[in-house]
Swiss-Prot record:
Domain named Protein kinase: residues: 470-749
Similarity comment: family membership: Belongs to the protein kinase superfamily. Tyr protein kinase family. Fibroblast growth factor receptor subfamily.
Signal peptide residue numbers: 1-48
Location(s) in or outside the cell: Membrane
Xref: Gene3D superfamilies: Cadherins, Phosphorylase Kinase, domain 1, Transferase(Phosphotransferase) domain 1
Biological process (GO), any one: wound healing
The protein's name in its UniProt record: Tyrosine kinase receptor Cad96Ca
Keyword vocabulary terms for this entry: ATP-binding, Glycoprotein, Kinase, Membrane, Nucleotide-binding, Receptor, Signal, Transferase, Transmembrane, Transmembrane helix, Tyrosine-protein kinase
Organism of origin: Drosophila melanogaster (Fruit fly)
Lineage: superkingdom: Eukaryota
């Protein structure tokens, strides 16, 4: 009994599975059948409504009256055609067989004496018409696009020689008559696939071209003065002229539309037949077909029913059905995957909110740092540069440093919690503490030697500052291998809160030599005590690449740029904020302050080697600070440094012994200071204007010196000239220069007459020879 019950339950479960499987298969089969049905309906509808439009044929004259004396090769007419689909068109000529019945029917000639160019549509005479005067016959001018053929009837009337003077010959070239312009530039109504009807076409035809047509539509003999055989009756496309009455349609029933032609040409019919179909097949048109009456001339008012195919009536239901089918499928899929879609939307929303908060915080911090003077000042234009992305330091080699950080962390855990190398320890990071963040500590078992000797020495000094406290903004300036960024440092140099600083670093393209130069500059600045005329070092980051040298931020920037920008303000003035117009006393004070700063560096045994206006920074209160110690060397022992490396050189600022003997000393800095004085007097002009670097070296060696500017007095120029003595021992010291400039400052004389400054004599040149400007 138990076995029977168990067997029964298993059968029920098996039946349920089969039923579920059958339902799934039925649903899938239904979807496939519906899709196939929709596709077949669309394909059938597309085949039923072939969008290929027939060509449109234009024949200027439907009645060619040609003299039998015409020469072979004469152009009879020019036929035009166009195709809305842009298909290639082929022209042709066919004989027109008249309707049966009637003795006066025009019979086609044995051979059509015309030929047409298949591409251009030019109809020419290909055989002589001599002896064929009086013949009348009909031909078809055809054009095909490969799918449909359009035909226009043309009535041919061959005239005798004596009738040539009084007869009419249709024009074969472009006429100057105004009314013939409409033959070439017709206006079209928007009717799909057929020829359009010209608005205002007269219902009556002017007399004189065709013989009068009697009431029974039988043509009589033409009024030519001779008894030629009459034209055929019931000519399709030719309607008799009925005065005061409407035109009577012909007996032939053809779905055609009249061609819009000149008012002087008769109306005709265009017969459209597919090439592959029988010529008797009716071509359904989008316009009602014309109906005819019997030859009795009575007009039939009742029109026969005609099926009008509409593209909208067939395609709209199909499109709606298919669209509804796909919408239903989309709704079903969205319902089934609603949980995943909601999770994706929540993730995107959170990401967008985080980005907006980050942007708002960055904008608020930037706006709180920049003052109105820094925004509006014309001098601050040189500070504009690319903005850092996300205000976050990103190391160059992430993968390598991730491995280093992992090894350092594991080492710290092994040593019982002692700080590992390179990992910031809790602290202020201020220069006043001997063990700040980033300092190397650890016991005997600690591993992780510094990458280089310079970094090893710097990691345990008071200048190390944690990188995460730096927030980068924009580039203040850059050279071939270095960059200076404007940053914000938190709690640096004993100052609580945020301090704006300048961070000097190297580009990724820098070489090992450039890296050593930056570390050498850092060592030079570490040996200096704070001085008002020397840029102050605030800290550094040397625990790993890239090395950061943190300097005080001088908001006015380079003295060279400041002097050049003062030229425009001297002429046009400053309408915003504090005026920057410089005076003779200001310029002399700049020289005095630079001399004070260089005297301090000299007393500490420092040779600058690149003293120029571009390496002097200036503050809002016109305080000058010597900066850029990239070439500086500590030569306190020998007093002389001999250059061994190659690179860009400030040729126009270098002394003769530096140019030719590679010898640098305090006296070579004195020479450069004289050039700096000339720069200040000329408001930032390039020394030796108009002379190449090679000529400068040769002329300076031969005794040539910078000439005295016109607006500079002799007393000030003499100080410059003393600095350019060929013998270094004859040049003054910085202490002596300070005394001479101090005397000039205490007099009321303007030694720089800026009102006489010749703007046209001094200009700035670009570096073309690899020199440093």
């Amino acid at each position: 009994m138990v076995y029977h019950h168990h067997n029964h339950e298993s059968r029920i479960i098996h039946c349920r599975k089969q039923l579920t499987s059958w339902r799934r298969r039925s649903l899938l089969l239904t979807i496939i059948v519906v899709t196939a049905t929709v596709v077949s309906l669309i394909s059938q509808e597309a085949e039923a409504h072939n969008q290929n439009a027939p060509p449109i044929l234009y024949v200027r004259e439907r009645n060619w009256r040609i003299s039998e004396t015409e020469k072979v090769g004469q152009i009879i007419d020019r036929v035009r055609a166009e195709d809305p689909d842009g298909d290639d068109l082929i022209f042709g000529i066919e004989p027109r067989f008249s309707l049966p019945g009637g003795e006066n029917d025009a019979s086609p000639p044995e051979k059509i004496p015309f030929q047409i160019d298949r591409e251009t549509g030019v109809v020419t005479l290909n055989e002589s018409l001599a002896g064929r005067a009086g013949q009348n016959f009909l031909i078809y001018i055809t054009v095909t696009d490969g799918s449909y053929t359009a035909k226009n009837e043309v009535f041919i009337n061959i005239l005798g020689e004596r009738e040539n003077s009084s007869g009419y010959r249709p024009q074969t070239s472009i006429s100057n008559v105004v009314h013939n312009i409409s033959q070439f530039l017709p206006r079209f109504d928007q009717l799909p696939g057929v020829q359009s009807i010209r608005n205002g076409l007269p219902n009556s035809r002017p007399g004189g071209w065709y013989p009068p047509v009697p009431q029974n539509n039988i043509f009589g003999p033409p009024p030519f003065g001779n008894n030629y055989p009459p034209p055929p009756p019931n000519i399709p496309g030719v309607r008799g002229e009925q005065s005061g009455e409407e035109e009577q349609p012909d007996e032939e029933v053809t779905p055609t539309t009249p061609v819009r032609i000149s008012s002087t040409t008769p109306k005709s019919r265009t017969k459209l037949t597919p090439i592959t179909a029988n010529n008797s097949t009716r071509v359904e048109s989008a316009i009602p077909a014309e109906t005819t009456t019997p030859s009795g001339g009575h007009h039939n008012n009742s029109s026969s029913p005609i099926t009008i195919f509409s593209l909208k009536s067939g395609t709209i239901p199909i499109v709606v059905t298919v669209g509804g089918f796909f919408v239903a499928i989309a709704v079903l899929l969205a319902y089934l995957c609603r949980r995943r879609l909601c999770a994706i939307s929540r993730t995107l929303k959170k990401t967008k909110e985080k980005e907006e908060l980050a942007k708002k915080s960055n904008q608020s911090q930037l706006s709180s740092t920049l003052t109105d003077d820094s925004r509006n000042s014309m001098v601050m234009q040189q500070w504009q540069g690319p903005v850092a992305f996300a205000n976050r330091y990103v190391p160059w080699e992430r993968d390598q440093q991730m491995g280093i950080a992992t090894s350092q962390l594991s080492t710290g855990v092994t040593n019982g919690g002692v700080s590992s190398p390179g990992v910031p320890s809790p602290g202020t990071g201020e220069p006043g503490s001997n063990l700040g963040p980033g300092c190397l500590t650890g016991g005997a078992g600690s591993s992780g030697a510094p990458e280089n000797a310079f970094a090893g020495e710097a990691n345990c000094d008071r200048w190390e500052f944690p990188r995460y406290r730096l927030k980068f903004f924009n580039i203040l300036g850059e050279g071939a291998f270095g960059q200076v960024w404007r940053c914000e440092a938190t709690n640096i140099n004993g100052n609580e809160g945020i301090t704006t600083v300048a961070v000097k670093t190297l580009k990724e393209s820098a070489t090992e030599v450039d890296r050593k130069d930056l570390l050498s500059e850092l060592e030079v600045m570490k040996s200096l005590e704070p001085h008002i005329n020397v840029v102050h070092l605030l800290g550094c980051c040397t625990d790993k690449d890239p090395t950061f040298v943190i300097l005080e931020y001088v908001n006015r920037g380079k003295l060279q740029t400041y002097l050049r920008s003062s030229r425009a303000e001297r002429h046009y003035g400053n309408t915003h904020g504090k005026s920057n117009v410089l005076t003779s006393c200001d310029l002399t004070s700049f020289m005095y302050q630079v001399a004070k700063g260089m005297d301090y560096l000299t007393s500490r045994g420092i040779i600058h080697r690149d003293l120029a206006a571009r390496n002097i920074l200036i503050t809002d209160d016109h305080t000058c600070k010597v900066a850029d110690f990239g070439f500086a060397r500590d030569v306190i022992t020998s007093k002389i440094y001999e250059r061994k490396s190659e690179g860009k050189l400030p040729i126009r600022w270098m002394a003769t012994e530096s140019l030719y003997d590679n010898i640098f000393s305090v006296k070579s800095d004195i020479w450069s200071f004289g050039i700096l004085m000339w720069e200040i007097v000329t408001l930032g002009s390039t020394p030796y204007p108009g002379i190449s670097a090679a000529d400068v070296m040769r002329k300076v060696r031969d005794g040539y010196r910078l000439e005295k500017p016109e607006h500079c007095r002799r007393e000030l120029y003499n100080i410059m000239y003393y600095c350019w003595s060929h013998d270094p021992q004859e040049r003054p010291l910085f202490a002596e220069i300070i005394q001479m400039l101090d005397k000039l400052l205490h007099t009321e004389m303007d030694y720089i007459e800026l009102e006489r400054f010749p703007d046209h004599n001094y200009y700035n040149i670009v570096s073309l020879s690899g020199e440093k400007l």
